[in-house]
Amino acid sequence: MEAAADGPAETQSPVEKDSPAKTQSPAQDTSIMSRNNADTGRVLALPEHKKKRKGNLPAESVKILRDWMYKHRFKAYPSEEEKQMLSEKTNLSLLQISNWFINARRRILPDMLQQRRNDPIIGHKTGKDAHATHLQSTEASVPAKSGPSGPDNVQSLPLWPLPKGQMSREKQPDPESAPSQKLTGIAQPKKKVKVSVTSPSSPELVSPEEHADFSSFLLLVDAAVQRAAELELEKKQEPNP
């Protein structure tokens, strides 16, 4: 009987030594698993938290940077002096400002430009400015083209009837350069000279065009008479054969 009692005791002792974990309660197992899950959740949440903190800048600093970019939206590349000035205003480092502008030129700047184009008030002002500059450029170019640059341009101007004395100064022919005109003037009858004497008495009967043509004819007659007098003097000075 003692041997039989010792036998079962010996068979139970190795089982108890080999499997101590099986004797734990289910409540302890669930608590251990919940702790492990909480630890893994914290480990996974740390990188996301750090990532969010990395890109967040103060709202006042971002507003200053956005205002500067809007003013210089057509050339949003600040120089070193401008970066230093923005750094003092925003209390940010030069590296942070440089990185913000790199990202803003890709994400914020296109929206700014598109918003300016879609704004009807700004677009209307831009159209008015362009029209005004176009008018100024055309007004500046017209005097340069219309101004006389030489004697050819002066001759192309419209002619108006001028007083008799002024026409005589402008249209007086050179006696040496126009011999054919002298000969035609000599061949004209002298009766028309008498008509010129009567013309001043009745200026209202003579049109401006006829008056202009008649004055030029008188100049030719005067030149012809002067030339005839010179020829007579030359004949008198020549010795008789």
Swiss-Prot record:
DNA-binding region extent: 48-111
Renumbered residue ranges of the record's region Disordered: 1-58, 126-210
Bias-annotated ranges (Polar residues): 21-39
Source species, domain of life: Eukaryota
Expression sites (tissue/organ): Specifically expressed in adult testis.
Main location class: nucleus
GO annotations of cellular component type: chromatin; nucleus
Alphabetical keyword list: DNA-binding, Homeobox, Nucleus, Transcription, Transcription regulation
Biased segments, Low complexity type: 195-206
Cellular compartment(s): Nucleus
GO BP terms, alphabetized: negative regulation of transcription by RNA polymerase II
TM region positions: none
One Gene Ontology term of the molecular function aspect: DNA-binding transcription repressor activity, RNA polymerase II-specific
Classification via CDD domains: homeodomain
Described purpose of this protein according to its UniProt entry: May have a transcription role in testis.
Similarity comment: family membership: Belongs to the TALE/TGIF homeobox family.
Name recorded for this polypeptide: Homeobox protein TGIF2LX
